[in-house]
Amino acid sequence: MEEKKIEQDELGYQLFPERGNGDRKKQGLLSKSLFTFNHKCQVMLKIALDTSPYAKLLLDAMKHTGCTVYKDRHFSCEECDGSVSGGFDAATSEIVLCQNNIHQQSHMNRVVTHELIHAFDHCRAHVDWFNNVRHLACSEIRAANLSGDCTLANELTRFKFGVKEHHKVCVRDRALRSILAVRNVSRETAEKAVDEVFDSCFNDHEPFGRIPHSKTDAKFAHRDFQNRDRYYANL
């Protein structure tokens, strides 16, 4: 049992207590509070899936690739530790949304998009999430690059001003932080993995076909994806 716990901690499960042994009990006022958080999370999730052009494109792409996403099956609003906002559990093909750490719709939209990119990678490629840190690094680079995490507006809210090539710097930094949060590896190992795959993964824009720097970009990308899908269907 102790070996299993160590293994789960090394894979980042300590950040998602409800993913582990499930021995946390919710009682009294805490239970009511968690119900409120969960309800709000579910409402914001539905809005994200119905209205976010980023999420809508990814859902279409997943369906096109043969991995249709179902809200009740593939998303789970849960309590998380620390400041983590979400995660993709490759073992269950579920996206975890941290109901205690996501309070605004714009934040929910970004988290859903970020984790759907991981789910898309899981669907289209043979990603060895648990044993190959380079595979994880590639998906984290893509998620940071394509989800809107590193738009100029979001960088300004983090008080990061005037950074040359801020987008690339942000993508590299956030990919590195994500790896260190969920894997028990040294910073040197994580940096090496990011550096080795950065160029190829940064330039892999599927299924968007471009870096969507705004909702407008994402809407155009979604339209282009739908037109491309219709074109191939008519061949």
Swiss-Prot record:
InterPro entries in UniProt: Peptidase_M76_ATP23
Q: What class of enzyme is it?
A: hydrolase
GO molecular-function terms, A-Z: metal ion binding; metalloendopeptidase activity
**What gene makes this protein?**
atp23
On whether Hydrolase is a keyword of this UniProt record, the answer is: yes
Q: Which keywords does UniProt give here?
A: Hydrolase, Metal-binding, Metalloprotease, Protease
Q: Which sites are catalytic?
A: 115
Q: What is this protein called?
A: Mitochondrial inner membrane protease ATP23 homolog
What protein family is recorded? Answer: Belongs to the peptidase M76 family.
Q: Among the record's GO biological process terms, what is one?
A: proteolysis
- The answer to whether the entry has keyword Metal-binding is yes
What Enzyme Commission number(s) apply to this enzyme?
3.4.24.-
Q: Which PROSITE patterns match?
A: ZINC_PROTEASE
* Species the sequence originates in: Xenopus tropicalis (Western clawed frog)
Q: Which Pfam families match?
A: Peptidase_M76 (PF09768)
Q: Which of this chain's residues are annotated to bind a divalent metal cation?
A: 114, 118
